[in-house]
Amino acid sequence: MLKYDVIVIGGGHAGVEAAAASARLGVPTLLITLKPENLGEMSCNPAIGGIAKGTLVKEIDALDGLMGYVIDQAGIHYKMLNETRGPAVWGPRAQADRKLYKKAMYQILTNYPNLDILYGKVEDIEIKSSKIEAVILNNGSKILCQKIILTTGTFLSGLIHIGQKKIPAGRVDEEPSYGLSNTLKQIGFKLARLKTGTPPRIDGRTIDYSKTILQPGDKIPRPFSELTNIVNVSQINCFITKTTSETHDIIRENLDKSAMYSGQIEGIGPRYCPSIEDKIVRFSTKSEHRIFLEPEGLDDYTIYPNGISTSLPEDVQHKLIKTIPGLENVKVLRPGYAIEYDYVDPREISVTLETKKIAGLYLAGQINGTTGYEEAAGQGIIAGINAALAVKDQAPFMLTRANSYIGVMIDDLTTFGTIEPYRMFTSRSEYRLSLRADNSDLRLTELGMNIGVVSEKRKKIFTKKCEDIEKIKSLLNTLSLTTSKLAKMGIQVAQDGTYKTVLDLFKIPNFNVEQAIKIFPMLKETQNKNILQLLYIEAKYASYLTRQHADINLFQSEEAQFIPKNIDYFKIPSISLEIQEKLSSHKPTTIGVARRIPGITPAAITAIIIYLKTKYSDGSST
């Protein structure tokens, strides 16, 4: 009988990261997927990154994950979103060649040490004494294991809706999983339904691009991965068009035929990625909505019209598309659809992503109520790391709100749960100026090195970068000019007769890296503009970052105040029954987590701290 230490069920974005992370830690790992050729399949939009999402990708890369490196092998349109705003909200994004992305992912995983890939379908999980024993395949065979990571995406009782038509599926042409849904229910997990959707795909050869707006990418693509020096994939343009009043009229006239508005769909859809029906209803005063025409590949004429996700009947989809400028004669290749699926209340898992009910069972991705490739991948890598560390009897690896967007996401999910698809935003992070995309490796790679999940190649690159940062920082502190010379160059500084270093100049409004290179040409020789940009940001926002670091220190002190598992909140007389019930239900692990539970007052937190000091002053906390 086959036996593995860790088995990952599902080969989507969460699954591939989980399997690779577990394998990197030297643990024999099996990835079970319906179609190995679809590893890392982009079920919806063929793009990686975006605002907040791009930071997640950089954090995954910092821990030696796959997503950033793979998109650099397949990215055909790179663009830094929000670049005209502050660096805390910059969002690296890349449109992908769908085929190249899957090909690169397949090549990496099929040659990954300690990782086997099995074509198959898991029907059940064998559990004994609340511990994982094995997985059972649909052919009746059993594979023994210590840990299981469930990354089922939209496959748990998945149901596609196109108008009134219902199609049981995990995605187009792939059957859903009912067995695992039943298993989770039998274990006692709280399952609910969520919904997501995708737009129709159209033939780019039938688009009149003269009626659209050109959207070029960045002139020089900025790679996601620290392992990538230059993006060598050909770059192409995207285009923008918009809906019209006629489009809106057709949608309004047919709302009763939409699966969303006919009452056919029970699941709640993503608030921040609404269907075109939702947009017309919720934003009824808007006369138009933008649509981004995004190519799906270099040698693929399929276009993804980002912005018109729909569950309307096929004939209505055809009608509304032809009212859009440039799409009057377009050929529809595949209809859009909505898909419903089961998910588990994420408050049923801990911050390691292990379930509280079953030891050795981990959940990652859409099964936890999230939406998006990047959110799934971020959970996958943490689940994979922790499953492998548990096999090795090592301490768990936990990211926090203070050091990563991944930590913010996991804390949000495990503390508050979610009743709608959870998407990451910069606004969810209270420390976003410190948690930027450009410093992800400086925040996380050393943590990854400490637990052994980072390769030797990445270690060398990271070590070299840290050395370069110190050298360039020293140079910036050395290069200087008098205020009078700077004034002659048109740079407005106080004429106090002092010398100003480059780091001083970075703090001046409207002064940037390009100006510094112009004044001090030797900075060109640093050969790393990314480091200059990093040091520029750190200098420019130094006072804000100092204050934020003080806030982070306070946060970390509260996170270090652990709450014993056996605490009885009903024995703390100075807090209300309502708060006692909330705390008993949530079971916060630290004072910091307790403070973030809605409705928990500062007075209650003080009461808990005092109680812990008196009750557990001998250090006993089990």
Curated annotation (Swiss-Prot):
<dbReference type="InterPro" id="IPR047001">
    <property type="entry name" value="MnmG_C_subdom"/>
</dbReference>
<dbReference type="Pfam" id="PF13932">
    <property type="entry name" value="SAM_GIDA_C"/>
</dbReference>
<keyword id="KW-0963">Cytoplasm</keyword>
<dbReference type="InterPro" id="IPR040131">
    <property type="entry name" value="MnmG_N"/>
</dbReference>
<dbReference type="InterPro" id="IPR026904">
    <property type="entry name" value="MnmG_C"/>
</dbReference>
<feature type="binding site">
    <location>
        <position position="122"/>
    </location>
    <ligand>
        <name>FAD</name>
    </ligand>
</feature>
<feature type="binding site">
    <location>
        <begin position="269"/>
        <end position="283"/>
    </location>
    <ligand>
        <name>NAD(+)</name>
    </ligand>
</feature>
<comment type="subunit">
    <text>Homodimer. Heterotetramer of two MnmE and two MnmG subunits.</text>
</comment>
<keyword id="KW-0285">Flavoprotein</keyword>
<dbReference type="GO" id="GO:0002098">
    <property type="term" value="P:tRNA wobble uridine modification"/>
</dbReference>
<dbReference type="GO" id="GO:0030488">
    <property type="term" value="P:tRNA methylation"/>
</dbReference>
<dbReference type="InterPro" id="IPR044920">
    <property type="entry name" value="MnmG_C_subdom_sf"/>
</dbReference>
<dbReference type="InterPro" id="IPR036188">
    <property type="entry name" value="FAD/NAD-bd_sf"/>
</dbReference>
<feature type="binding site">
    <location>
        <begin position="10"/>
        <end position="15"/>
    </location>
    <ligand>
        <name>FAD</name>
    </ligand>
</feature>
<keyword id="KW-0520">NAD</keyword>
<dbReference type="InterPro" id="IPR004416">
    <property type="entry name" value="MnmG"/>
</dbReference>
<keyword id="KW-0819">tRNA processing</keyword>
<dbReference type="GO" id="GO:0005829">
    <property type="term" value="C:cytosol"/>
</dbReference>
<feature type="binding site">
    <location>
        <position position="177"/>
    </location>
    <ligand>
        <name>FAD</name>
    </ligand>
</feature>
<protein>
    <recommendedName>
        <fullName>tRNA uridine 5-carboxymethylaminomethyl modification enzyme MnmG</fullName>
    </recommendedName>
</protein>
<comment type="similarity">
    <text>Belongs to the MnmG family.</text>
</comment>
<dbReference type="InterPro" id="IPR020595">
    <property type="entry name" value="MnmG-rel_CS"/>
</dbReference>
<dbReference type="Pfam" id="PF21680">
    <property type="entry name" value="GIDA_C_1st"/>
</dbReference>
<dbReference type="InterPro" id="IPR002218">
    <property type="entry name" value="MnmG-rel"/>
</dbReference>
<dbReference type="Pfam" id="PF01134">
    <property type="entry name" value="GIDA"/>
</dbReference>
<dbReference type="GO" id="GO:0050660">
    <property type="term" value="F:flavin adenine dinucleotide binding"/>
</dbReference>
<feature type="binding site">
    <location>
        <position position="366"/>
    </location>
    <ligand>
        <name>FAD</name>
    </ligand>
</feature>
<comment type="function">
    <text>NAD-binding protein involved in the addition of a carboxymethylaminomethyl (cmnm) group at the wobble position (U34) of certain tRNAs, forming tRNA-cmnm(5)s(2)U34.</text>
</comment>
<dbReference type="InterPro" id="IPR049312">
    <property type="entry name" value="GIDA_C_N"/>
</dbReference>
<keyword id="KW-0274">FAD</keyword>
